[in-house]
């Protein structure tokens, strides 16, 4: 049975829209007992704000987790992946643990950097000696939405990122 018929680009877009109905832009746990993780790290929450960003929006990735290692600092890195599992970019941050073992931080992805599409986040927690403590794959997923364009260009702009670059005519 044929479910969809169209060009390759139309087919990819069709299935991306179907998959976007199953996006999970946040994951939250109320207590460390129910949270994802292990004896070292328990995930409290990961969120993308706004949940359905446009390419022209600043995108905030908010992270919160319990550091159960006893160390005062802990590293967390993420890879942002596209629909085809290609790494768009990654980042690392050294968290300082609070009195209640919580670590909280927000990463800002500037407006006009991301192209439209569906993205996933992998998380990696490590000690300051870079010993891997926990890896969480595809922990959240979200779609960055294109804005209406005023020019006659049709179709998706190439690339995973779409930075608004400064051009100087000379």
Which functions belong to the PLM regions below?
Residues 1-170:
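Localized sequence-composition bias
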């Amino acid at each position: 049975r044929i479910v969809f018929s169209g060009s390759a680009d139309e087919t990819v877009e069709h299935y991306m829209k179907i998959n976007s109905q199953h996006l999970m832009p946040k994951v939250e746990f109320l207590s460390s007992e129910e949270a994802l993780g292990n004896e070292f790290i328990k995930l409290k929450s990961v969120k993308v704000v706004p949940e359905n960003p446009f390419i022209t929006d600043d995108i905030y990735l908010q992270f919160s987790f319990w550091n159960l290692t006893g160390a005062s600092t802990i590293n967390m890195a993420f890879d942002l992946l596209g629909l085809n599992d290609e790494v768009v970019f990654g980042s690392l941050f050294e968290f300082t643990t609070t009195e209640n073992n919580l670590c909280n931080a927000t990463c800002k992805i500037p407006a006009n950097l991301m192209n439209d599409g569906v993205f996933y986040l992998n998380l990696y927690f490590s000690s300051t000696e870079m010993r891997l403590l926990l890896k969480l794959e595809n922990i959240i997923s979200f779609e960055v939405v294109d804005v209406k364009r005023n020019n006659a260009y049709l179709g998706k702009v190439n690339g995973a990122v779409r930075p608004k670059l400064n051009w100087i005519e000379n």
